[in-house]
A protein has these predicted regions:
Chain B
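Sec-dependent bacterial lipoprotein signal peptides
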Residues: 1-21
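Bacterial Sec-dependent N-terminal signal peptides
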Residues: 17-43
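Short, solvent-exposed beta-strand/turn "edge" segments of beta-rich domains on protein surfaces
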Residues: 31-34, 72-79, 170
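Extended low-complexity, serine/threonine- and proline-enriched intrinsically disordered segments
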Residues: 39-45, 104-119
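N-terminal edge beta-strand
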Residues: 50-78
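Short beta-strand segments enriched for Tyr within beta-sheet-rich domains
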Residues: 81-85
Length: 773, 184
């Protein structure tokens, strides 16, 4: 419609212009010069404001505009590097107008091109958030920050603890690489969130699908890469301060980074970073959740040195958190659970408080890492990384010991200390004939776990060794990739059985492989296909659990004869990207044989707290198939609509049934209006979005106390902009409202869905002050 | 230049060595110690006016899991009699066994025993003790039987720290057992 009107107007304009040519013989001509030097300026634009006519100055700085009708005109002369100049004219005949332009102080910002080394398989979909998209997630925990990716959801224990789920797989089936080191915490528990401060990262990436060859055991569902920015070698001091406030939980987060080089010490760079977080009780639309506060203190230090081909980096980080566990989720027996479910809302009511009482967990995670690499002149590259992690988890039960003198000590009821030493050596061979590049690597891991308190999982020593080889062939539009790996793992467990120390040895070994192809049909259109295998040895909780899981009101029993899980993953994707429209369609089919899960047993088990449903760790064969679709279309000027769809179907093929705890399908739509750039502020936007999560209808019958919660739809709005405070200082402001209409809902993958609703409306204000180069 | 490289390699090697201070998890196995485990619950019925005491127990010496409960007695009482009912809780996984009853008595303002017969006509329970806040406890009380019949007696210990209000609702179960009750 608009277009027709436009063409019509254009025609009229052309006709009237034509009609007037006979009388319009006026002209303007002149010379454009630099005010200071007096030199002619070549290539400056001289145009008539409000009309579509303009000319460039020639090699002598001359210009001439002809065939003008008599009348008043505004002439503008401009060129980059000079202030534009306007002049009003009353034309009756020919006129000469010379311009003397004043040089403008324009400093174009340096353009920096950085390349990132990502070891992820190139034929697998890799999604990344960084920059302002990542900024929008600031203040949230790692899993929440990743929820924007299609195919990524989260497994929650209330609102403060969440862990990422990729294509329906989580915990030990997802590998998290924190700054190049595999994160080793007590990942087996669903209430054990990854101990990583997202403020460390300037890039968060997700490799969807099995990536067992490059990363070894556990990367069945995918890999999450948490990567900091390259250290600022030989740069002046810079930094940023982030402050985020949330109304729900009255949570405040403050994080700062300072970095730079050292004068007189060439090739050196350093960075210091710290985060503080404090939040109180979370509120659902109707009530507060008692004891859901959080307090977090993290910091990291990094330094590095670069000289020619040599690079050395050292990194230290400490993550320290204290999380309250919703006291209404504490149950002693099945009767307690059923009465909470029947009540429909928690029995324990509270107001707002920052206080964190029992039950709670205090977790600290310490990482120290040293990495060195050397680029040889001939193109070979060698990299060696060593790291030590200490994960210290303390869980405090609701009930203190009845014995007063013991209670006064306030000891945690459960303590795990997990120490991990990793060692990775990677050799990138020099490209052969400019087309074949590859790497050969060896990684080892030594780990020991010490536990104290309520019997849950045993102490253990674990040793892993993996050897891998990958090659990539690139030729006109094609990229082919192949790799293989061998892993060997020993595990020795130590338990007390009838007051005797019992140790048990396990040995696991496995081959994995990957084969992939990428075809770039054009600059805009590409396709990828990857077949990958991965494996995962059963972890100690699956081997040795034996007791009531109070949070789940279930008696869980491990099985020491479990065999490793093996996954075969096929993933294909098509991608189209043009300036106005981008779309990515991915499909995957993941077969996991000997998939370990908790199988409900026919007979309940009797304890002093009553009869509990009895679940045993069992193996089956499962298939995970799904579709991820994301598309974004700038359908009108400045206005973009984005849609993301995740669809997943999981089936237990051995028992001909569905599997429990699989995220439901969802669609996320956003419409965003970006304001045109202004001299003072830029990147200003306003967006409104909706997330629709379907009900999970594919669950095995009689497998749960409660049917999966119904579907829900949440609205959110966001707005933000960036101001240039000065040449080297920027202030970014963002406001967002999640769950705009304060809807009561429960998510199937929130373990507290039995007890309470999910979080209500949450307004957040985000400020980011960036300074320095 | 050569020098810095040498130094850096040495540093890195030194770091690698310091990383290898391994420890063995097997040297440090602690005896599992579950706080306040209850492995045995004994109900002692003493017929009024006599010294005849009969005890009925639930025993699971190794706690949850492991071996199944070794004992879960059927309560046998006479019709139309009045009994004094006392309860005893023990943790027999420790040597010597620790007496949880004493600890419950010490923190009586956080605990409540609930005795629920089904059908309710089998037995009537009356509390015989009160805590500092004048709420009943149930460590001792009276049980009155009526006509003969068979059913269950549900015995619960509600743990209600800070929330005890005289009703069973707040808190969570520390004990929840369904004894078979025969009045004959």
């Amino acid at each position: 419609m608009n277009r027709i009107v436009f063409v019509f107007l254009l025609l009229i304009a052309a006709l009237t212009a034509h009609a007037q040519t006979s009388e319009c013989a006026c002209f303007v001509k002149g010379v454009v010069k630099d005010q200071h030097t007096g030199q002619p300026i070549i290539g400056a634009t001289v145009l008539i404001v409000g009309q579509n006519s303009g000319v460039f100055t020639d090699e002598y700085g001359r210009y001439e505009l002809r065939n003008l009708c008599p009348g008043a005109y505004t002439l503008e002369c401009r060129i980059i590097g000079y202030n534009p100049f306007r002049e009003k004219l009353d034309l009756t005949a020919g006129h000469e107008e010379n311009f003397n332009l004043l040089e403008q102080e324009v400093h174009l910002k340096d353009v920096e091109i950085t390349a990132h080394r990502t070891d992820a398989p190139s034929s697998q979909p890799l999604s990344t958030i960084s920059g302002s998209d990542l900024d929008r997630t600031r203040g949230q925990n790692l899993a929440e920050s990743l929820k924007g990716f299609t195919g990524v959801t989260s497994l929650q224990t209330g609102s403060s603890i969440s862990k990422p789920v990729i294509h329906g797989l989580h915990s030990n089936r997802i590998l998290i690489m924190n700054n190049g080191v595999r994160q080793e915490g007590q990942q087996w528990g669903s209430e054990h969130a990854p101990e990583i401060d997202p403020f460390i990262a300037t890039r968060l990436s997700v490799v969807k699908g099995a990536a067992g060859v490059r990363y070894g055991s556990d990367a069945i569902g995918g890999v999450i890469l948490v990567e900091p920015e390259e250290l600022p070698f030989d740069k002046s001091l810079s930094g940023e301060v982030n402050a985020v406030g949330f109304t729900n939980g009255r949570q405040g987060v403050l994080s700062g980074t300072l970095q730079g080089g050292i004068k007189g010490f060439k090739g050196f760079g350093w960075r210091a970073q710290g985060t503080m977080k404090r939040g109180g009780n979370i509120r659902t639309p109707d009530y507060f959740l008692d004891n859901t506060g959080i307090s977090e203190k993290n910091f990291s230090l990094a330094a590095g040195y670069r000289n020619k081909g040599l690079g050395i980096d050292v990194f230290y980080s400490r993550f320290d958190t204290k999380i309250g566990i919703f006291s209404g989720s504490h149950i002693g027996s099945v009767t307690d659970l059923l009465s909470v479910i029947e009540n429909g809302e928690p029995f324990v009511k509270s107001g707002f408080s920052y206080n964190i009482a029992r039950p709670n967990q205090n977790v600290s995670h310490e990482l120290i890492k040293a990495e060195t690499h050397y680029h040889f002149q001939n193109g070979n590259r060698f990299q060696w990384t060593i790291a030590r992690q200490l994960n210290d988890r303390n869980e405090f039960d609701l009930h203190r010991p009845r014995n007063d003198s013991i209670a006064a000590l306030n000891h945690p009821e459960l303590t795990f200390k997990l120490t991990t030493l990793t060692n990775d050596v990677i050799w990138d061979h020099k490209p052969i004939a400019g087309k074949l590049a590859g790497q050969l690597g060896i990684s080892t891991l030594y780990q020991y776990n010490l536990m104290d308190g309520r019997p849950l999982i045993p102490n253990f020593n674990q040793f892993n060794m993996g050897l891998f080889w990958m090659e990539r062939y690139v030729k006109s539009g094609w990229e082919l990739e192949a790799g293989m790996r061998y892993d060997y793992r020993t595990l020795t467990s130590f338990r007390i059985v009838n007051r005797e120390k019992v140790s048990q040895d396990f040995k696991f070994s496995n081959f994995s492989g990957t084969l992939g192809a990428t075809r770039n049909f054009s600059e805009k259109f590409s396709a990828r296909l990857n077949f990958g295998t991965a494996w995962r040895a059963p972890n100690v909780s699956e081997l040795f659990s034996d007791g009531v899981h109070h949070g789940a009101a279930a008696f869980e029993k491990g099985d020491a004869t479990l065999q490793p899980e093996k996954a075969l993953n096929t993933i294909a994707s098509l991608k189209y990207a043009s300036p106005k429209f981008t779309a990515e369609l991915g499909g995957y089919y993941n077969i996991i044989s000997d998939f370990i899960y908790l199988k409900p047993q026919p007979e309940p088990i009797l304890t002093v707290r009553g009869a509990f449903p009895y679940f045993k760790y069992t193996q089956t064969d499962a298939t995970f198939k799904g579709i991820d679709l994301s598309a974004s279309w700038e359908f009108a000027r400045y206005t973009t609509v984005t849609s993301k769809l995740s669809y997943l179907r999981v089936y237990d093929t051995r028992n001909d049934n569905y599997l429990v705890m699989i995220p439901s399908n969802r669609i996320d739509n956003q419409i965003k209006y970006e304001l045109p750039e202004d001299a003072k502020w830029h990147k200003a936007y306003f967006s409104i979005g909706n997330l629709f999560v379907a009900q999970q209808k594919r669950v095995p019958p009689a497998s749960d106390f409660l049917a999966p919660p119904s579907a829900y739809s949440l609205w959110n709005v966001q707005t933000g902009t960036t101001f240039d405070l000065s040449e080297k200082q920027q202030l970014e402001i963002g406001i967002s409202v999640q769950n705009l209409f304060n809807v009561s809902y429960r998510d199937y993958l929130n373990r507290f869905r039995y007890y309470a609703d999910d979080m209500g409306r949450n307004v957040s204000l985000r400020l980011k002050w960036k300074f320095g180069a | 230049m050569k020098m810095t490289r040498k130094i850096s390699w040495t540093l890195l090697l030194a770091a690698a060595v310091s990383f290898t201070q391994c420890k063995d998890a097997g040297d440090d196995v602690q005896i599992d110690d579950e706080n306040e485990l209850i492995t045995s619950v004994t109900l002692k019925f003493t017929e009024e006016g006599t010294n005849n005491t009969t005890s009925f127990s639930y025993k699971d010496a190794d706690g949850d899991g492991g071996n199944a409960p070794a004992r879960f007695d059927t309560i046998a009482l006479k019709p139309n009699k009045t009994y004094t009912l006392a309860i005893e809780l023990l943790d027999e996984s420790k040597t010597p066994a620790s007496n949880i009853t004493d600890e419950v008595a010490e923190e009586s303002d956080e605990h409540l025993f609930v005795y629920t017969p089904a059908p309710s006509t089998l037995l009537t329970y009356t509390y015989g003790d009160k805590d500092a806040n004048n709420y009943v406890i149930g460590l001792t009380g009276k049980a009155v039987t009526t006509v003969a019949g068979t059913g269950t007696l549900k015995v619960r210990l509600r743990h209600q720290p800070g929330t005890k209000n005289g009703t069973p609702s707040p808190g969570s179960d520390d004990v929840n057992l369904d004894f078979i009750l025969k009045v004959q």
